[in-house]
Amino acid sequence: MTESDLGKVIVIHRDSNRLLYYNGAKLERAFRVATGLPAYPTPLGKFEIITKQRDPWWYPPQGSEWAAGKEPVPPGPGNPLGTRWLGISSPYVGIHGTPDAASIGYSASHGCIRMLVSQAEWLFDRVDVGTPVFIVPA
């Protein structure tokens, strides 16, 4: 087995709000991110990227109390997803940019993983549908 056999992997350390991007055995980049609030924790486990969207629409998650009465938000500066969405195999959870840079480094979301917009764009360009995503506590 060679380093290239290992492929691309994202590891998110939920409690320390860090996202690590590996290409093979090599750590390419580490990012500070925002993860879920205690009332809306980012799920732990092994997932994978299932969708990639440029300039996504934001839709209120069905059945979410916090989103009741909210309207969809089109792409643009007011969109809470920024310019990129990487949906993972956990309902309504993804990795995305955020216009709220002050939230980075904190537990501040409703379960998603927020990144600075430029960093989400960087990651988006390097991962594929099927890329593994491991979300661990520490």
Question: Which residues does each PLM region occupy?
Answer:
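Exported/periplasmic cell-wall-interacting domains
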Residues: 1-5, 37-40, 44, 57, ...
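Cell wall/extracellular polymer interaction/catalysis modules
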Residues: 1-56
